[in-house]
UniProtKB/Swiss-Prot annotation:
Main location: membrane
Family: Belongs to the UPF0182 family.
Name of the molecule in the record: UPF0182 protein CTC_00086
Listed HAMAP family: UPF0182
Membrane-related topology note: Multi-pass membrane protein
TM segment ranges: 9-29, 47-67, 87-107, 146-166, 195-215, 242-262, 266-286
InterPro entries for this protein: UPF0182 (IPR005372)
Compartments (UniProt record): Cell membrane
A GO cellular-component term linked to this record: extracellular region
């Protein structure tokens, strides 16, 4: 019998250990992973903070409930109910644990922010409090208020439950004897049992109600009631006034309730509660009446100061309050010499577009079906001594395409992508395809940019774990009929010892970790390999850019992710996409082989990122620590620029009257990607150019604005990204009395030009044939003029065809030209026609007709043969002849 008990005890212990291990696997794995990356303190910050808060809050809640229970003890027959003491202690432990766990796990981060708040040095216009109060402190105070209110309500319910449990036996006897339930008797018994306690709790509840309205009054700065976001005329003059009355009445009411319960008087309690209830109801009704009958008919006058607050604080919150504004008068007086003076800008004009280039990369540079290019990034590199804009993309593994898709293939053999594809943005091949500088597998590199190890273990598509240093060699890249193999030479990974095999088998619910003979003690597992998820795992409080970009530095591959601090608690700031404050305050840099990840602060003027750095002391590094070779490739990100542009559509207006009237509303310019398609928002282009009145070329991010519901451009916003001017925004305002073509309007101009439209019609053969596509529209400011650039793509028939650049359209002033290359188009655009001798027009026309017939026949033959390069060449010649004939 004793032996059976021992066996049973051991079995229970083993079962509990397995259950504990199962629950603990995620924690153990995460701890090892953070330890590997030297971020143990970041990981343990949450754990220890929750632990401290749980212990403290558990003790406070347990003691409060127990003292409350002991205060009821005087009215309990303790000898009769002494056996319930252990039950009450257990019940108190459970309740206190639940409250403590809820509080510590949900609000640990708010408490850290509260304790590590950093002033904004900007005060709100209503309560004169620093913005940091609203960002860091008010949310926590609100959470504490809700928690305490719940505990107080629980105490009332707890009292009633305790009363009925203790007196249940007597009450059942009474009901059986009298056949009725004496409500008055119960009421008096409750008063005798816990009258004083309920008086105190009820009074505290009312006291906290007054505190709740103090918090609610502060939240008026987020009111959506008026014309704008933030406290309006009605909020300040009516709602705030009534809130203050409720605060005073609730405070007085708490005293009245306490005294009345002690004296067993119900009437004063009812009067107090009814008065508070009526005040709460009156706030909504009174505010609505004032808004309808007073404010709406005098809106502009009454709301003007509050609109002023909204304009000022929205511009501050989205960092558009310090934009340099320049009046850009369009003179259209460029000469060929001006073009020569801006040669570097002209040479770097992008004639390749993102989507067609990515499509071409995936068709011709993946090499095998199991490779994929996720997206294309634009960057600038000094190539062979010359500053150049390029497209670059990582060749990553597409694990879904691996055949056979076995566990070994997915996790042990196919572990990494290989290399990059890089092409020039300013040129194409004779066929109109991207002009590659780095391509193929193994890498063919025509630049002086070296990549010693092109393997990509950490990327945008590396969503699964990989086990390296196994008995199986890793697939490196295809080489003819055979495959090149390799072995991981990085330093990352968690050792796969027996304990870790068990932990991962439990965590991943996969016995292969234990059964595979290929995984040895020397093997390591790489987890959290998706670079964005990797960053989120370490710093989930940051918001990450949708488009990480790849950088070649020191002969290695690195990923750069832009990280943002955001909030929806900035007073008076108009929300956009659920936020009303944003800063690009950090850059995350990840090694593509080792997975080493570093967070760098790039904006020390952002109080939120400074607060984060105080909370997580070992997480962030200073901007100066970023390697110089990577600094050269930092870009102002599109995500924040798009948000700023969206806000700027309305908030470029700083005059309240103009703002209220909507006199000068803008919208981001629309564009058209294919012939006769719907409009879509124009993508903001990165361009390498010299800003007007500046001496040096640099990478700029441009946004084009139209007048609202019109296709004429009103302005252009430029974001700079050199180290000295990083993030500086410049707005070029165009004259309102001139018609400035927007990207969409420019497309219509192209289609309305008789010569170009004829040629495009010949290209656009029709259903079942080739299709014409527009590229990205680039509008380049040069001196006091605008040069429009548009690439024309031709897509051949067939699902595997990729669009190819077949023409460049340039426009300046009223002139528009189409040619096969940028140089030819520029020559045609800026070279004046020389006066020639008179010719026999009739003879020339006859000869031209004959020549046109010959070229037309050749073009049709090339079309049938699928030789689109020759077809384009013949069509161009035919167009030139037709152009000559109509002169």
């Amino acid at each position: 019998m004793k032996k059976k008990k021992v066996i049973t005890f051991i079995a229970i212990i083993i079962l509990l250990l397995i259950l504990f291990l199962y629950r603990s696997t995620s924690f153990i794995i995460d701890f090892q992973w953070f330890q590997e990356l030297s971020y143990t303190s970041v990981f343990l910050k949450e754990f220890f903070t929750i632990g401290k808060l749980f212990t403290l809050s558990f003790a406070l809640i347990f003691i409060s409930i127990w003292l409350y229970y002991l205060s009821l003890k005087k009215n309990i027959n303790w000898q009769e109910h002494n056996k319930r003491k252990k039950l009450m202690i257990a019940f108190n432990c459970i309740v206190s644990s639940l409250f403590a766990y809820f509080f510590s796990s949900k609000y640990w981060y708010q408490i850290l922010q509260f304790n590590n708040s950093v002033p904004f040095d900007i005060k709100d216009p209503i309560f004169n409090k620093d913005i940091s109060f609203y960002i860091f402190k008010l949310p926590f105070l609100q959470s504490i208020y809700v928690l305490i209110l719940r505990v107080l309500v629980f105490l009332v319910i707890y009292t009633l439950i305790l009363y009925f449990i203790i007196n249940l036996k007597d009450k059942i006897k009474e009901i059986n004897f009298r056949k009725t339930l004496n409500i008055k008797s119960i009421k008096n018994d409750v008063k005798d049992f816990a009258g004083k306690q309920l008086a105190v709790v009820s009074a505290i509840i009312l006291l906290f109600l007054s505190m709740g309205y103090i918090i609610k009054s502060r939240n008026l700065v987020y009111s959506p009631r008026g014309l704008i976001f933030g406290a309006s005329y009605t909020d300040i003059n009516i709602s705030l006034l009534i809130y203050r009355i409720i605060i005073i009445v609730s405070f007085i009411g708490s005293i009245v309730v306490f005294i009345s319960i002690i004296n067993k008087k119900i009437k004063p309690i009812i009067i107090s509660l009814v008065l508070i209830f009526l005040l709460i109801l009156s706030e909504g009704a009174t505010s609505k009446l004032v808004q309808t009958f007073v404010v709406n008919s005098n809106e502009k006058k009454l709301e003007e100061p509050f609109v002023r607050y909204n304009i000022d604080y929205t511009r501050k919150a989205f960092d558009i309050d310090d934009i340099e504004e320049i009046n850009f008068d369009i003179n259209n007086n460029l000469t060929a010499q001006d073009i020569k003076n801006n040669k570097e800008s002209i040479d770097n004009i992008r004639i390749n577009s993102f989507e067609p280039a990515l499509e071409f990369y995936n068709q011709y540079q993946t090499i095998r079906p199991y490779y994929i290019f996720n997206d294309i990034d634009i960057d600038r590199y000094k190539i062979n001594g010359k500053e150049s804009q390029i497209f670059i993309s990582a060749r990553e593994l597409n694990l879904k395409a691996i055949e056979p898709n076995t566990w070994q293939n997915r996790h042990l053999i196919y572990t990494h992508g290989y290399g990059v594809a890089m092409s020039k943005v300013n040129s194409v091949t004779e066929e109109g395809q991207p002009d590659f500088s780095i391509k193929d597998i193994p890498q063919v590199n025509n630049t002086d940019i070296l990549i010693d190890n092109p393997r990509i273990y950490f990327g945008e598509k590396t969503d699964e774990y990989a086990i390296i240093n196994t008995k199986l060699k890793e697939f490196d890249y295809p080489q003819g009929a055979n495959n090149k193999i390799t072995e991981y030479d990085g330093k990352s990974g968690i050792k796969m010892n027996l304990l870790n095999k068990i932990i991962f088998a439990i965590n991943k619910k996969d016995l292969n970790f234990l059964l595979s003979r290929d995984v040895t003690r020397e093997s390591r597992i790489l987890i959290n390999r998706n670079i964005v998820e990797r960053a989120k795992k370490i710093a989930p409080f940051l918001t990450y850019d949708n488009d990480p970009h790849l950088v070649i530095h020191d002969n290695k591959l690195y990923w750069v992710i832009d990280a943002y601090t955001t909030s929806n608690k900035y007073p008076y700031s108009q929300p956009y996409e659920d936020i009303n404050y944003i800063r690009n305050s950090a850059k995350v840099i990840i090694d593509a082989i080792d997975g080493d990840i570093n967070f760098y602060i790039t904006n020390k003027n952002d109080p939120i990122i400074v607060s984060y750095s105080k909370i997580f002391k070992n997480l962030f590094k200073d901007y100066s620590k970023i390697p110089e070779g990577i600094k050269e490739h930092l870009k102002y990100p599109e995500d924040i620029f798009k948000i700023q542009c969206k806000v700027f559509e309305k908030y470029h207006m700083t005059d309240t009257i103009a703002f209220l009237n909507g006199d000068d509303l803008w919208e981001l310019s629309q564009d058209e990607k294919t012939m006769n398609t719907d409009k879509a928002t124009n993508e903001s282009p990165y361009v390498f150019m010299k800003l007007p009145n500046d001496n040096l070329e640099e990478m700029i991010l441009l946004g084009y604005f139209n007048m609202k519901q019109r296709n004429t451009m009103s302005s252009m916003l430029a974001a700079r990204m050199t180290s000295d001017n990083y993030g500086k925004l410049i707005m070029y305002r165009f004259p309102i009395h001139k018609t400035i073509y927007s990207p969409y309007f420019f497309k219509q101009k192209i289609k309305q030009d008789p010569l170009i439209s004829k040629e495009l019609s010949l290209w656009n053969i029709g259903e079942g044939g080739a299709k014409v596509q527009f590229g990205d529209t680039i509008i380049l400011p040069i001196n006091n003029s605008l040069l429009y650039v548009e690439s024309m793509y031709l897509r051949a028939k067939g699902k595997n065809s990729a669009p190819e650049v077949k023409g460049i359209i340039l426009s300046y002033g009223d002139k528009i030209v189409l040619d096969t290359t940028m140089d030819e188009a520029l020559t045609k655009l800026f070279t004046k026609k020389e006066e020639g001798k008179e010719e026999n027009i009739e003879d020339n026309k006859i000869n031209s007709i004959k020549e046109a017939k010959v070229i037309y026949d050749k073009a049709i033959k090339a079309q049938r043969d699928g030789d689109w390069a020759k077809y384009g060449e013949y069509i161009k010649k035919l167009g030139n002849i037709l152009e000559y004939m109509v002169k």
